[in-house]
């Protein structure tokens, strides 16, 4: 495992002129432990900044971590026995980011055993402006993507996931789908939800898991990035355990 100290060095001064190796497909055992990963990121992430001020450093920090540890920030898999459609957070790179999505997918695949997992990232800008304006159009676009996946993969168990602004996008997508369509969704899992406390429209609350940490300003409707908003990787196993019975 490559040293996490390298990550801190690369992020020092917010400079990224180094040649970054292409991410490789690796097993999670080659990643840092979740606690090590989060501890090191906490040293370099813009804790206490607004999302507007923090955007570039969030993107660069996740890019560096992805390159160092072979964590894929982009997923466009074919459908599996179970398929996750995941919307990343504001300023997260790729189409699934690094902070939350990959850890959840890995935990879910482990929990599924021999069943196949397909992951598809939601291709939306994840911009600061979209976050501040409610990401409405992105929700409409995700709703269309959901319908497309259900049509092309009628036998898959579809799970919707989102982190930060991505949770907002999932809420907006559900609001643009009727109950009959949403009934085909097996589970919804949201991390760091800006709409915390608001139910997912047209969907069974018993099949919804919303994880919001104490002290997460984003979950309180704010725009300040505090440490509790960056640590949802530690909930990956819990989220996977929630999903598995719903896709069995």
Curated annotation (Swiss-Prot):
Activity regulation info: Weakly inhibited by n-undecyl phosphonate (C11Y4). Activity unaffected by paraoxon.
UniProt-annotated location(s): Secreted
Signal peptide: 1-17
One CC-aspect GO term: extracellular region
Spans annotated as Lid covering the active site of the uncomplexed enzyme: 31-70
Chief place of localization: secreted
Keyword Lipid metabolism found: no
Gene Ontology biological process terms, A to Z: carbohydrate catabolic process
Catalytically driven reaction(s): cutin + H2O = cutin monomers
SMART domains: Cutinase (SM01110)
Stated pH dependence: Optimum pH is 4-7.
EC annotation from Swiss-Prot or TrEMBL: 3.1.1.74
UniProt keywords, alphabetically: Disulfide bond, Hydrolase, Secreted, Serine esterase, Signal
Repeat listed as a keyword: no
Chain positions listed as propeptide in the UniProt record: 18-28
Entries under PROSITE patterns matching the protein: CUTINASE_1, CUTINASE_2
Active site (UniProt): 164, 216, 229
Gene Ontology molecular function, alphabetical: cutinase activity
Record PTM: The 2 disulfide bonds play a critical role in holding the catalytic residues in juxta-position; reduction of the disulfide bridges results in the complete inactivation of the enzyme.
Superkingdom of this protein's organism: Eukaryota
Matches recorded under InterPro entries: AB_hydrolase_fold, Cutinase/axe, CUTINASE_1, CUTINASE_2, Cutinase_monf
Family under the similarity heading: Belongs to the cutinase family.
Function field: Catalyzes the hydrolysis of complex carboxylic polyesters found in the cell wall of plants. Degrades cutin, a macromolecule that forms the structure of the plant cuticle.
Protein name in the entry: Cutinase
Organism: Hypocrea jecorina (strain ATCC 56765 / BCRC 32924 / NRRL 11460 / Rut C-30)
């Amino acid at each position: 495992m490559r040293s996490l100290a390298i990550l801190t060095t690369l992020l020092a001064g917010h400079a990224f002129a180094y040649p970054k190796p292409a991410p490789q497909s690796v097993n999670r055992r080659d990643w840092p432990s979740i606690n090590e990963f989060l501890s090191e990121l906490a040293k370099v992430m813009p804790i206490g900044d607004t999302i507007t001020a923090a955007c570039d450093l969030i993107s660069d920090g996740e890019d560096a971590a992805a390159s160092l540890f072979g964590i894929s920030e982009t997923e466009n898999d074919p459908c599996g026995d179970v398929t996750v459609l995941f919307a990343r957070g504001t300023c997260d790179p790729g189409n699934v980011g690094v902070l939350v999505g990959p850890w959840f997918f890995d935990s879910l695949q482990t929990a599924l055993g021999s069943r196949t997992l397909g992951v598809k990232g939601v291709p939306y800008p994840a911009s600061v402006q979209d976050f501040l304006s409610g990401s409405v159009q992105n929700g409409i676009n995700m709703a269309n993507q959901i319908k497309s996946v259900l049509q092309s993969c009628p036998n898959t168990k579809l799970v919707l996931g989102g982190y930060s602004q991505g949770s907002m996008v999932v809420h907006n997508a559900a609001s643009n789908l009727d109950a009959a369509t949403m009934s085909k969704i097996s589970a919804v899992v949201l991390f760091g939800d800006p709409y915390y406390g608001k139910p997912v429209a047209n969907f069974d609350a018993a099949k919804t898991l919303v994880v919001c940490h104490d002290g997460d300003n984003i979950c309180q409707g704010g725009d300040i990035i505090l440490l509790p908003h960056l640590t949802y990787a530690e909930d990956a196993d819990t989220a996977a355990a929630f999903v598995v019975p719903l896709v069995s």
